[in-house]
Amino acid sequence: MSTCSSSEIAEKKRIALAKLQAKKSQLLASAPATNGKSTTSATGATQHANNGKSNPNQPQAKSPLNFYRSPTGEQKKINRSGPTPGDNKSSSFLNALKAIKQTSNRELSRGAAHPYQRPNGGNERNKPTLSLSSDKEKPVAVLLGNSITCNLYLISTHRFAAQTSGYHEQLVTVFKNMPTKCYDGQTRIWSFDLSDYQSLKTHAADLKPYVHMNGIPKKVLDLCGQPPVVPERSVLASIEPKLADQLMPFQQDGVCFAIAQKGRIMICDEMGLGKTYQALAVADYFKDDWPLLVCTTASTRDSWAKHIMDLLPKVPIHYVQVLNNNQLYVGEAKVLITSYNMMERHEDKLMQRKFGFIIFDESHTLKNSKAKCTTTAKRLTDQAKRVVLLSGTPALSRPLELFTQLQMIDGKFMNFMEFTTRYCDGKQSTFGWDANGQSNLEELKVILHLKYMLRRTKVEVLPQLAEKNRETVVLDPALVWTNAETKETLDAFNKELKTAKGRATEEILLRFYARTAEVKTRAVCAYLKTLVKEQKKFIIFAHHRVMMDAISDFLSGLKVHYIRIDGQTRSDHRSDSVDTFQKKSSCKVALLSLKACNSGITLTAAEIIVFAELDWNPSTLAQAESRAHRIGQTKPVICRYLIAHNTADDIIWNMLKNKQEVLSKVGIFAENLQKATHTAAPTSSHKIEEYFSPSTSTSLEPERNSIKQYFSTIPAKEPPEQNNNTEMTKVNKAESDIAAFFNDDDDEAFLELDI
């Protein structure tokens, strides 16, 4: 729902009051013409009352409490408080006083609820009087035209657009007089060259107060007015030859652009395009500004150290240090690699070292401006000369997450209020300043790509890369809803979500998310059993421990060789597990934590990626997909999302759709999860549609393993005891069929596995 500013509310109120006063004046102006009729009617009624004659069949007229005449004009105008036929003088006078008292009380009640104070004498305007005298009323001029808002924003480095909240003829005339005008009939948006910006604002200023113009910030215009920076490829000659020779053409372009921006840049290429190589190349070019600080996730510290020693052989090994619990001495290290947690804990030591070049890997970790880790990073960047931020997903769900990262590159661009008001639809709410929205995203995209951010997708720079396809697999409901208690629990969560508001919704959804993981375990394991038979290497991503433990136990029971990496896996064991999956053909499955392993590892040996659970952010899922779909992948990759209907999956999938639309407008998310092919998991039960559309099912009797067997409440016509025995027999038979499916380990496919 759109909101109005206080100035817009005041303007609309003023216009409404003016129109009301004008209407009132018009009615009062016509009062003399009808005054004679009212007087005649009143006199006749008085004489009739004095004679004591009244017609019992004639209904008594009641005094109206408004100024409006009869639509037909044929009915006589009755004085507001004058005597009516059949009434005597005293009763007429008492009725008039009663009407005045009732109207006065109504006016007081209405005035108390009004958000603004009425003008002086405002309470008197609708009170009934004993006459229609217009001596106190003065005509008010009627305002012509409507008040609208016109928002101006950039759509490219040399053009801007104008979007209006309504139609205004004079404003359209101003648009048509601009030399570089262009009108889009589909979106109904005007666009112009930046050379017409000042002229348009000057002419639109004459239309106040009917047109309120929201202009482009001066800082944005100044940024567009700067001469373009032309990268020079000659700078590549100053980079370590071993590293420069391994850079692909698009990576060389990225290095040149970063150097042209004086080493303060966000490299946000899509996952798997070698951001690490580009960052090290830029750091090597500015090696005179070292010492170098690399902040990354805890699981990728050793990987960074390995890359530095391999790609920059001129850096002595003893000058490269990894900051961990065992190595807390910073000393004279030329290159220090630390996790974000260790950076926060040892802020003072790092500040004393005065690093001149800083690399923040997975920089979206710093999205929260109030987090201690972010404030530490901001202090370090303030004293550093060069800052490079690396992230394939710089914002996970909303534009606000970009602010802190932009501040680390250019702290003078915009402050918090300016940025959130312009690009986050910032406004004051009951709970404070609300900056979780989005606005002017096209302009934000232009600014990011103009100076601050470098982003390329795999489709753009690696058209020869193996294809990636997505599929959503609907799990067998008979394996999800295994008892009546499960169905009641899920139904209860769905009902709570429909009535909950605010933070209560988030809490319920989190519990719903955890419960969904529990009920999906059997169905997920059943699907994995069919997948193992294909003898292809695949990755399984899960989040909750209950899901990971269930899959781990299931694979162990099938005697499948697999690796498991989660948040508790040590970094040295982590790298060994990755090597095992990549190099050993007998290792078929990699069971990974969705949070701990969505970045920083390469598993191109996998052909299939399975998501046993969803995540709140589309960027997290895209990062996880890129563990296999990246440089070095030679086979097509299939990403399968296992969905259970009527669970939290339905809600989260819709949330992912909305978030990816916002991120796509900013130009930092190129994937489309909604284009996934929909399939159904193999099931021995009846058609899957009957579980979700029972009204259209043509089956009269429940089939084997049908979910209806467990929740049927229609009693049969047989005796109660016999009915109970029959139902128990059906349930036991269904459960035995499911158990037989899981315990069927004598398949020929398993005998051929290379274990």
UniProtKB/Swiss-Prot annotation:
One of its GO terms (cellular component) is nuclear replication fork. Residues 139-217 form the HARP domain. The gene is Marcal1. Residues 26-91, 104-134 are annotated as: Disordered. Residues 527-681 form the Helicase C-terminal domain. Residues 256-412 form the Helicase ATP-binding domain. It is found in: Nucleus. Signal peptide: none annotated. ATP binds at residues 269-276. The keyword Repeat applies. InterPro entries: HARP_dom (IPR010003), Helicase_ATP-bd (IPR014001), Helicase_C-like (IPR001650), P-loop_NTPase (IPR027417), SNF2-like_sf (IPR038718), SNF2/RAD54-like_C (IPR049730), SNF2_N (IPR000330). ATP-dependent annealing helicase that catalyzes the rewinding of the stably unwound DNA. Residues 32-63 have a biased composition (Polar residues). Belongs to the SNF2/RAD54 helicase family. SMARCAL1 subfamily. Its EC number is 3.6.4.-. Its main location: nucleus. It comes from the Eukaryota. Residues 7-27 form a coiled coil. A motif (DESH box) lies at residues 361-364. This is SWI/SNF-related matrix-associated actin-dependent regulator of chromatin subfamily A-like protein 1. It holds the Pfam family SNF2-rel_dom. GO terms for molecular function: ATP binding; ATP-dependent DNA/DNA annealing activity; four-way junction helicase activity; hydrolase activity. The modification Phosphoserine is found at residue 63. Keywords: ATP-binding, Coiled coil, Helicase, Hydrolase, Nucleotide-binding, Nucleus, Phosphoprotein, Repeat. It comes from Drosophila melanogaster. GO terms for biological process: DNA repair; heteroduplex formation involved in double-strand break repair via synthesis-dependent strand annealing; regulation of transcription by RNA polymerase II; replication fork processing.
